[in-house]
Amino acid sequence: MIQRQTYLNVADNSGAKKVQVIGIPYAPRKYATLGDVVTVTVKEALPQGNAKKGKIYRAIIVRTAKEVRRPDGSYIKFDDNACVLLNQYGEPLGTRVLGPIAREVRNKGFTKIASLAPEVV
């Protein structure tokens, strides 16, 4: 359950460490969940990384601390809120994805991110 002003960890090697959600496009909702695309701004970044502090990117949410109910009745939740930064074409900005990601990301059509992840839960 992600809303505006929420800080997210970045689960790729794009150079950004923490981002803040500034918008939830494509949905007239207040909250975003697993597999949703949000607009973020970089708050912490590594100096040699591709993503620079203050820049605005699109990102897909891959982990949430709030549990999400699946169609089979099970629930999935993670220890943190995390995202993967996207370029203007919807492809991941980094070349690696760190940590597990939710199956909902693959189901929403982001197969490239799912293939880069070490584990799809």
From Swiss-Prot:
- Keyword hit for Cell division: no
One Gene Ontology term from the biological process aspect of the record: translation
Database matches in InterPro entries: Ribosomal_uL14, Ribosomal_uL14_bac-type, Ribosomal_uL14_CS, Ribosomal_uL14_sf
Q: What PROSITE patterns does the annotation carry?
A: RIBOSOMAL_L14
Superkingdom of the organism of origin: Bacteria
Keyword set, alphabetical order: Ribonucleoprotein, Ribosomal protein, RNA-binding, rRNA-binding
Q: What does this protein do?
A: Binds to 23S rRNA. Forms part of two intersubunit bridges in the 70S ribosome.
Which protein family is it in?
A: Belongs to the universal ribosomal protein uL14 family.
Subunit description = Part of the 50S ribosomal subunit. Forms a cluster with proteins L3 and L19. In the 70S ribosome, L14 and L19 interact and together make contacts with the 16S rRNA in bridges B5 and B8.
Stored PANTHER family: 50S/60S RIBOSOMAL PROTEIN L14/L23, LARGE RIBOSOMAL SUBUNIT PROTEIN UL14M
Q: Spell out the protein name for this chain.
A: Large ribosomal subunit protein uL14
Q: Which gene encodes it?
A: rplN
